[in-house]
């Protein structure tokens, strides 16, 4: 939960101060001028108690105004959305009893103000060229764009490797499904790989938020790599969850919140699928319902797939059904029945060619 809250904090803040936003342009101007600065977003009742002196500005925000006002020693107070400058050259007097891990006066004041008020507080270092964000108990230092780009590119390369391993795992699983040789161990291995890919994706999305306008190419690469991974994961969970009515979106979210060490625990994934923990469960045969494979057949609507699974229950039963039998399913005519049979045969042939033995 703590890690999730911190991730949400970072994501919300980075949207405000990402490159390309007016606030970030103003902050960068202050950083380059080496004047330092202390900026608080929001003026609530708690803020009123700690603000002393200064000038009431109440003007629309602009990067140039922020730069000029930062030349004065005091703190600048903006509206909560950062679109208006409310006060300038104010002295902030937070409660000295609030603990702070910072050493510099400006950073210490920023941390205490953030803890006391819950407002976003931005401290711009005069000498170290560092921008630090505080809100409540959270602290985040913005990194140099070049450093972030390097890390984002490294993460994309890592994602490519993990995605290739995942794709091969899904191909192998598909081949086993047609041979009716799947065990829960095979399924859990693929779910684990899906989660690793989704976690790297989340990390790259944080980099993209921090890069702002500079992250367009990274965004395009990310979409190209993992555009269908989440949907594939949902079909996989629908295939193997104990109950067909299980909310697989909720299950996927629960798996995403597992700690890395818990994700390696196969029993945690078994529990998420709705099964009880037993010692030999992993080696038991698993029979997919067929959502993932049937969705690979072009122009086959989701409702028709639901009707097929309502009728047959599992992929193995669909595979042995004749065209005439499929024709009797609600919504499936002669043409669709032929399309399903041909589609399954084509997918099976392709999977057998592509899989690694």
Curated annotation (Swiss-Prot):
GO terms for biological process: DNA repair. The keyword GTP-binding does not apply. It catalyses: 2 ATP = 3',3'-c-di-AMP + 2 diphosphate. It is an enzyme of class 2 (transferase). GO terms for molecular function: adenylate cyclase activity; ATP binding; diadenylate cyclase activity; DNA binding. Disulfide bonds: none annotated. Signal peptide: none annotated. ATP binds at residues 74, 92, 105-109. Its EC number is 2.7.7.85. It holds the Pfam family DisA-linker. The keyword DNA damage applies. Residues 7-145 form the DAC domain. Keywords: ATP-binding, DNA damage, DNA repair, DNA-binding, Magnesium, Nucleotide-binding, Nucleotidyltransferase, Transferase. Its cofactor is Mg(2+). SUPFAM superfamilies: RuvA domain 2-like, YojJ-like. InterPro entries: DisA, DisA_sf, DNA_integrity_DisA_N_sf, DNA_integrity_scan_DisA_link, DNA_integrity_scan_DisA_N, DNA_integrity_scanning_protein, RuvA_2-like. Belongs to the DisA family. Homooctamer. Participates in a DNA-damage check-point that is active prior to asymmetric division when DNA is damaged. DisA forms globular foci that rapidly scan along the chromosomes during sporulation, searching for lesions. When a lesion is present, DisA pauses at the lesion site. This triggers a cellular response that culminates in a temporary block in sporulation initiation. NCBIfam families: PRK13482.1 (NF010009). This is DNA integrity scanning protein DisA. It comes from Shouchella clausii (strain KSM-K16). The lineage of its organism: Bacteria, Bacillati, Bacillota, Bacilli, Bacillales. The gene is disA.
